[in-house]
Amino acid sequence: MIKNAIKKVVSGQHLSEEEAGAVMEQIMEGGASPAQIASLLTAMRLKGETVDEITGFARVMRQKSTRVKSKHPVLVDTCGTGGDGAGTFNISTAAAFVVAGAGVPVAKHGNRSVSSRCGSADVLEELGVRVDLDREAVEECLNMVGMAFLFAPLLHRSMGYVAGPRREIGIRTVFNILGPLTNPAGANAQVLGVYSPFLAEMLAKVLARLGVSRAFVVHGAGGLDEISLAGPSILCEVRNGSVRRGLLDPARFGFRYAPVSVLAGGTPRENAAIALKILEGERGARRDVVVLNAALGLVAGGKARNIAEGLEIAALSIDSGLAVAKLRELVEFTGNLSCGEAAVR
């Protein structure tokens, strides 16, 4: 299958969703050589991936993941693509605690640093959260705490087949955008930040195809894969299978514009300190951007009827102490798990 797919893509033709899924199945089962995988990924990058192709890949990757079960009817994920090169602190990770603090269950999917100095797993570890949990421990955490971190390398074992080819070709491929589309807990509400404005509507259409109930796919002013304060951000809303594209202007909600530079992060320790200060109530542009992004998560999760109400609830989550309390609860719960509940690295 993969040989035919390579020939088709090299000739400039697109794969159907079914063809892409069949190729992904072959890759995820170890049936493709590293050279074939590298050739396909490079050819797809040069041609440009389509909604059909990304959907086919994501659907199979979801099926091959280690599935995490939850008692919650609604789960929010705030995982973005990364790759914006802006070097900001971990905005979506801080926003996840604000959403969870407001009572909306969060299944935060993420990894260690790939395209930045600090990934979500890195900053969570600095905050004291244990991330190396097996499926049963993640499920218990999600059901008891109402928030859990889903560490991608432990829940997407089949991705090991593509790690070598991706590393060796050293270019951005479709796999750079599959992570946020393949939450192992099947999160049905999302805030997904993308590094390119071109990807916003495309990935929104993919989420709609995959059956996500409510989502916002965003590309921030200044090139961020988050809603930013630098100006109006692209906002694509997924709702009931349809996609609506628009802009979110922070000034409309009373926020002052601020350059991306004021959101600068650093090492995992520095980013953890920034996140903790925000959750403890420090005011300023960094809090504002977290509240904005959390508001979208609250709307997607059904807690807020609109962005304005989401902003009020997000601010209350911080000011009431509930957001930082959720962090402390997660730290305590994961720290008390027995060694047997940690996955082998």
From Swiss-Prot:
Catalyzed reaction equations: N-(5-phospho-beta-D-ribosyl)anthranilate + diphosphate = 5-phospho-alpha-D-ribose 1-diphosphate + anthranilate
List of residues binding anthranilate 2: 166
Keywords: Amino-acid biosynthesis, Aromatic amino acid biosynthesis, Glycosyltransferase, Magnesium, Metal-binding, Transferase, Tryptophan biosynthesis
EC number: 2.4.2.18
Annotated pathway: Amino-acid biosynthesis; L-tryptophan biosynthesis; L-tryptophan from chorismate: step 2/5
Binding site for Mg(2+) 2: 225-226
Binding site for anthranilate 1: 80, 111
Binding-site residues for 5-phospho-alpha-D-ribose 1-diphosphate, renumbered to this chain: 80, 83-84, 88, 90-93, 108-116, 120
Record-linked Pfam families: Glycos_trans_3N (PF02885), Glycos_transf_3 (PF00591)
Oligomeric form and interacting partners: Homodimer.
Name listed for the protein in its UniProt record: Anthranilate phosphoribosyltransferase
Organism: Pelotomaculum thermopropionicum (strain DSM 13744 / JCM 10971 / SI)
Gene (UniProt): trpD
